[in-house]
Every structure is written in C-alpha cells, then in structure tokens.
C-alpha cells in the first residue's frame, strides 16, 4: 500500500481551479461560488498571481454584518499570503491529504512558482483525494 501511495501525484488528480479577481465584490463572489458549486475560490491579482483564498466561511462572515455586499471587495475579507497553504503538481497525494487534515481545510491551490509569484494551475480537494484512494482500493493495490 505504501508503495502504491508513493506513486499518486497531484498532477494526476487535480481539478480546474475557480479563481476570482481581488477586486470583485463579496456579492459577486457569493454568486460565483454558488454557480460553480465550490467551497473555496482562489483570489488572484491583475497578473493572475495568487494573493488570497476565499472560503464559504469568509463569505458567510462578511454577509452577517450590515455592510453593502456589492461595495466590499473580496480582498478585504480573504485569507492572505503568507497564511495560504498550497501545493505543487509534483507533490504526493498522501502529503497533500496530510496538509488538508492538519489545517482542517477542504482544498488547496495547486501552484506553479514563477519569478513574480505563484500562478494557480489547479486545485486539489478532499473529493479528488478520496476518488484516488477509492480507485486504489478497487485495484486491490
């Protein structure tokens, strides 16, 4: 089993990321999260580089107050660097699973390190990892 787990990489199981610009409103982010049916969105700057993560909890917290959600940009409420846990496509799935458990989060951005910052190239979720482990079990590892 250990040998099999050491051959499961993020690149083979990652899914398409849902990214939003740091200037969009909280209201628009709520609509987008609902339409895309995701629990986390990755926030990028004008250079398409990762600057934050936006969770359901962030959006819910913002909507509880009396603020006008159309006038608040998501960069006010998002989790910012360096408090973002991320992974690369070359990481082992088992290591990413451990990060998700340790941080008690549902997904991670898959990033490519560039000279200017981190480019979001995918996402890995608890569901992606569960599918991989179920497939491994079905193969009889």
Give names to the regions the model predicted:
Residues 38, 42, 50-65, 105-106, ...:
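Short beta->alpha transition motifs characteristic of CBS
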Residues 8, 24, 54, 72, ...:
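Short beta-to-alpha loop/turn elements within the nucleotide-binding domains of ABC transporters
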Residues 19-37, 44-45, 85-106, 110-113, ...:
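The conserved cystathionine-beta-synthase
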